[in-house]
Amino acid sequence: MQTYTYVSKGKFELMEKPKPVLMDERDAIVKVTLASICPSDLHIKHGSVPRAVPGITVGHEMVGIVEDIGSAVTNVKPGDRVTVNVETFCGECFFCRHGYVNNCTDQNGGWALGCRIDGGQAEYVRVPFADQGLNKIPDHVTDRQALLVGDVLATGFWAARISEIKEEDTVLIIGAGPTGICTLLCVMLKNPKRIIVCERDEGRIRFIHEHYPEILTVSPEACADYVRANSDHGGADVVLEVAGAESTFRLAWECARPNAVVTVVALYDKAQTLPLPDMYGKNLTFKTGGVDGCNCEEILRLIAEGRLNTEPLITHTYPLDRIEEAYTLFENKMDGVIKVAIEW
């Protein structure tokens, strides 16, 4: 089968590999029908993910059709259309039982697909712990509508959930890339008083204005003053940092009012510093919002009800044999790209 594979630092390659087979009674084999490219794939390409193993097929955002299941799998059957969770998790350890599946302690737990084991930018993928990692797609939900459920949409949903958003709040979201927009959609479900999105890219600002005209937008340079002028208590009640730069990390806590919640959703290429003398007295609560894929069934229900729609984010579609073009487009943010779908 065709796969897109991490060969060495800076190099992915389209190559043939054997079709995966069941290796455990809890596995499933999924025929991939649609996949996407994530910034995390780019981190692997450039050597920023030490756990990533050269020779691994990349890709962790995908949907498909179950082809085969192990003897212990009960939640899905061959022929089911499914989303695939970016995380594999056992469902039995302390963290899984308490809903923190991102911290699963099994050796295959956490982010394995497309990082430590072969992922889904391929014709087929083996999914460990299939009962936890696969969710059936409702009949009237399309593959494109469900494509982002297992990663960036689950990330945004978890981040919004842990941020304690109330209807009287002013919420600031820093960053309007794919994860930032998914976070925005999930924050909108909480119906806060106002939402401000901070973004520098004019194309992404236009996207926000076109699709979500009720949302306020501001550039990073004007953000602090704008938030103070458009909030009730001298700053945002909740800040979600989804951009992942040193400057945006600082901007997040600077724009927060005293006693606010600051949720860090982004990944950073290097460690960040909390300048505690500058922050003293703000009494901020910091949370981290890394993807926790325990809510995928609820997210699919919201999509089926018409309350969540990420299809507009899929701005470009390529076949697998042109995936290198798709990566070039996505990495260089060309032609107004938000998300790219890879189809078979």
Task: Describe each PLM feature range.
Residues L34, N85, L240-V242, W344:
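Short, well-ordered coil/turn residues at beta-beta hairpins
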Residues E199, A266, G290:
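Conserved acidic E/D residue at the C-terminus of a beta-strand in Rossmann-like folds
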Residues K136-E221, D225:
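Mid-domain Rossmann-like dinucleotide-binding core that forms the NAD(H)/NADP(H) cofactor-binding site
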Residues E92-I174:
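NAD(P)H dinucleotide-binding glycine-rich loop of Rossmann-like/cofactor-binding domains
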Residues G79, E168, E214, G235-A236, ...:
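Local beta-strand N-terminus motif with an aromatic residue
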Residues P20-A35, S48-R97, P138-V141:
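Glycine-rich beta-strand-centered segment in the early N-terminal region that forms part
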Residues M1, Y226, R250-E254, G293-W344:
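C-terminal hydrophobic helical "lid"/dimerization subdomain
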Residues S163, M188, I205-T285:
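Glycine-rich cofactor phosphate-binding loops and adjacent beta1-alpha1 units
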